[in-house]
Curated annotation (Swiss-Prot):
Record-stated family: Belongs to the NAD-dependent DNA ligase family. LigA subfamily.
SMART domains, alphabetized: BRCT (SM00292), HhH1 (SM00278), LIGANc (SM00532)
Functional note: DNA ligase that catalyzes the formation of phosphodiester linkages between 5'-phosphoryl and 3'-hydroxyl groups in double-stranded DNA using NAD as a coenzyme and as the energy source for the reaction. It is essential for DNA replication and repair of damaged DNA.
Gene name in the database record: ligA
Top-rank taxon, per record: Bacteria
Record-listed NAD(+) binding positions: N32, F33, E34, Y35, D36, S80, L81, R125, E159, K297
Protein name: DNA ligase
Coiled coil start-end: none
Cited SUPFAM superfamilies: BRCT domain (SSF52113), DNA ligase/mRNA capping enzyme, catalytic domain (SSF56091), Nucleic acid-binding proteins (SSF50249), RuvA domain 2-like (SSF47781)
EC number per UniProt: 6.5.1.2
Keywords: DNA damage, DNA repair, DNA replication, Ligase, Magnesium, Manganese, Metal-binding, NAD, Zinc
Length: 653
């Protein structure tokens, strides 16, 4: 059954991606014949197993916008579990019984109801007594079965979560640092409680079952492990669980602890239940907690240190956050010397003063925080001027939280987005200048305009004393800046951040005008719209950018720092026109995979990120690899060639 469930998941994702690309990008990644073949295979597997996942093309759920989320009272209150931070306490609690130890996932708890094999209701935990009905949203969870091979009524609980990888991908699409989601749990909560489930569908919410609440034959299973295995057979993903006794508890705890950092999903500790269902239920409950389970949170390692200064960090929206700088301490295996205080309210509540003795820890073993101020010498002054631009500041209050803002609309901190884009890999490719580093350089007043980046070598003392920098990293940064002084024209144009002008469009425009900057910068809308793939909107934005006086000054300063790498006016040959390549693995003859990509595009070819029926060649020096791309290429009969074979192909074309 598990093999079939995995194949159902694989087919659902593959067909969904094919439909998305066709509908949103007007291109095909598989032929109609291939699509129909895979569709028929999926439909047959769904009929055999009774499992239909959310997103299945055989049962597409229509999107719907609601005016509100109805509230519903739970049949029985959902109590929290009692907690401990001590492994010996877990062992004592379990005694001589068997237990089920599993992750306490950090998302949003959902109660699902199925009748006659169909998902009919989903309700959030809410306050434990009343939750919100989110059935429409649950129907677009990435891995949730809409139908199951069970005809009676089934009620289960589980956790809706957003994986770290999806969280980072979603945040990467949000340019404003302060608009980014703080953690996967907050993003998940907002996603599950959307009024428009089309938004939920884009968030890749996953559901992991952790409890069977009710079914028609409740006496069918004697242990929780049997319940978990049965839920897996029905098509549910279940929280990872381990059978434990007092003897193997410590060893099992070490297993879970070692996986915290590598897990792709957020967790907030562990939960332990008695495996024997009847025994656990016989224990009853207190007024606050059920007695059949207990939660575990790892004890935070707390260290005492001395507060050295408060750094005021300005951001793109004008928000100025206080950051505590203290004497370095070792926490959870890493050296920590700073922690965000988040806002004025927290800073005032801690009554911080320079030289105070403070205790610090890592929340969830990851994020440094100040736990307490042991000496409380008094409030630090709140700056009346912005540390970046010198403009006036203002304290704004939202509910009970006070935050500091710069009121200058021209504050340099708000330019971080353009700086970050300018140095990115596909633009000027300056390594060592992350957004965080750029923010520090701006905050210290070391860079004000884009051209200032080319003079960071003048600030060795200031930069080498910054956290994360030393002599070596400073030299690497300077070397990277110097290499960036000879860009190709297309990457320079892209680095300017012109609206709607990506690297591919920049290459088309530069090629059209013979890689001549003067011609490119003076192009007209009529000239640009003659280029295939350049429409009126892009052309107008392009021309408008170069006509603005402030942009002319920026470019004038930049041109004093760089010399364009000479390119052939012909822009390469058309040897590879009509051919699509995918590049994977390490390269030997080229500097990196991007260089291979540039060569292919210079000769009229196209490079994509995934192997599809439209791919002509997969370039991989290890053509015997069992990687997913190699497997896919073999399945589709696509040649897998080495770099040398690619070079030979290019020379012979």
């Amino acid at each position: 059954m598990q093999g079939k469930k995995q194949r159902i998941t694989q087919l659902t994702e593959l067909l969904d991606e094919a439909a998305r690309v066709y509908e949103q990008e007007d291109r095909e990644i598989m032929s109609n014949f291939e699509y129909d073949k895979l569709y028929d295979e999926l439909k047959k597997l769904e009929e055999e197993t009774g499992i239909v996942l959310a997103g299945s093309p055989t049962r597409k759920v229509g999107y719907e916008i609601l005016s509100e989320l109805p509230k519903e009272r739970h049949e029985s209150a959902m109590l929290s579990l009692d907690k401990t931070k001590e492994v010996p306490a877990l062992i004592d609690w379990l005694g001589n019984k068997e237990g089920i130890l599993s992750w306490k996932m950090d998302g949003l708890t959902i109660v699902l109801t199925y009748r006659n094999g169909e998902l009919v209701k989903a309700v959030t935990r809410g306050n434990g007594e009343v939750g919100e009905v989110v059935t429409n949203n649950a129907k677009v969870f990435k891995n949730l079965p809409l139908t199951i091979p069970y005809e009676g009524e089934l009620i289960i609980r589980g956790e809706a979560v957003i994986r770290y990888s999806d969280f980072e991908m979603i945040n990467a699409q949000i340019p404003d640092a302060d608009a980014k989601y703080k953690n996967p749990r907050n993003l998940c909560s907002g996603s599950v409680r959307q009024l428009n489930n089309a938004i939920t569908a884009k968030r890749n919410v996953n559901f992991f079952a952790f409890a069977l609440i009710r079914m028609d034959e409740m006496n069918r299973f004697k242990t929780m492990m049997e319940q978990f295995n049965w839920l897996k057979e029905l098509g549910f993903d279940v929280v990872e669980e381990k059978l434990v006794t007092a003897e193997n508890m410590a060893e099992t705890m070490e297993y879970f602890e070692s996986h915290i950092i590598t897990n792709d999903f957020p967790s907030d500790g562990l939960v332990l239940f008695f495996n024997d269902i009847a025994y656990g239920e016989s224990l009853g409950r207190t007024s606050k907690f059920p007695r059949n389970g207990i939660a575990f949170k790892w004890r935070d390692e707390i260290k005492e240190t001395t507060l050295q200064e408060i750094e005021w960090s300005a951001s793109r929206t004008g928000l100025i956050n206080p950051v505590a700088i203290f004497e370095p301490v070792e926490l959870e295996g890493t050296t920590v010397s700073r922690a965000s205080l988040h806002n004025i309210s927290i800073m005032e509540g801690l009554e911080l003063g320079l030289g105070d003795k403070v205790t610090v820890y890592k929340a969830n073993m990851i994020i440094p925080q100040i736990a307490d101020n042991l000496t409380r010498s008094g409030h630090l002054p709140i700056p009346k001027t912005c540390p970046v631009c010198g403009g006036d500041t203002m304290i704004k209050q939202d509910s009970d939280v006070k935050s500091l803002y710069c009121m200058n609309p021209e504050c340099l901190a708000k330019k971080i987005k353009s700086f970050t884009h300018f140095v990115s890999r596909d633009a000027m490719n300056i390594e060592g200048l992350s957004e965080a580093t750029i923010e520090k350089l701006i905050a210290k007043g070391l860079i004000k305009e884009l051209a200032d980046i080319f003079h960071v070598k003048d600030f060795k003392e200031e930069i080498t004393t910054m956290e994360g920098f030393g002599e070596k990293s400073f030299r690497n940064l300077v070397d990277s800046v110097e290499k960036a002084r000879t860009p190709i024209l297309a990457k320079f144009i892209y680095s300017l951040g012109i609206a709607n002008v990506g690297l591919a469009n920049a290459k088309l425009i530069c090629k059209e005008f013979g890689y001549d900057f003067n011609k490119v910068s003076n192009a007209t809308v009529d000239e640009l719209t003659q280029i295939p793939q350049i429409g009126y909107v892009i052309a107008e934005a392009f021309v408008s950018y170069f006509q603005k006086p402030e942009n002319k000054l920026i470019i004038e300063d930049l041109l004093k720092e760089i010399t364009f790498e000479k390119e052939e006016a012909a822009g390469g040959s058309e040897k590879l026109k009509g051919l699509t390549f995918v590049i994977t693995g390490s390269v030997e003859h080229f500097t990196n995979r991007n260089e291979v990509k540039d060569v292919i595009e210079q000769h009229g070819g196209k490079v994509t990120g995934s192997v599809t029926a439209k791919t002509n060649y997969l370039i991989n020096n290890d053509n015997t690899s069992s990687s997913s791309k190699n497997k896919k290429a073999r399945e589709l009969g696509i040649p897998v060639i080495t770099e040398e074979e690619f070079i030979q192909l290019l020379n012979e074309a």
